[in-house]
Amino acid sequence: MADLRLNYVLLEMKLKPEEDNTKKAATWSYYTRDDVKKFVKKANNYGIDVIPEINSPGHMNVWLENYPEYQLADNSGRKDPNKLDISNPEAVKFYKTLIDEYDGVFTTKYWHMGADEYMIGTSFDNYSKLKTFAEKQYGAGATPNDAFTGFINDIDKYVKAKGKQLRIWNDGIVNTKNVSLNKDIVIEYWYGAGRKPQELVQDGYTLMNATQALYWS
């Protein structure tokens, strides 16, 4: 990478969780803190910034398989380990604790929360609790997309307090009625779902071209 003058690498990986409210997630393959620190140090020596990603609120099965209490349940009561229940304050706290654990290992000024494909293979219609939560939290007429956007903004506020800038994927960003996505978030445009890039730029958002047509093989 250094020879090609590439200076960023996005690392979606699992750091061994060690906090009391996360350590049951120490399954699958993971890296230790020493492993990651050595990797980050070597990358930094070559001028490469290593950006960690824990995708949320979707794609969370490697973290939530042993935490059913944080999994989102559909209208029939069936829980999905891929989906964090953003209406549950304890589930949100769980994700923030993971951020804290990574923060002590990575030196970058960025945090990537993914935020893509939350409803892949399904729709918000099957999760009426998010509609109820959205209206309670964000007012009359709020939709699950408002709740989703509000969750992203909450994480943005959390990482900003740590001196970091939030990065997300684009496909979950839609026009919302009650909650607007924070403008300081970097949107990595990888897929043609959600709002068009021209609209986002016109509204003052910072975009990075990460289109799958060019970079996903």
State what each model feature region is:
Residues M1-K164:
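Substrate-binding cleft of carbohydrate-active enzyme catalytic domains
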Residues D116-G121, Y127-S217:
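Catalytic-core regions of glycoside hydrolase
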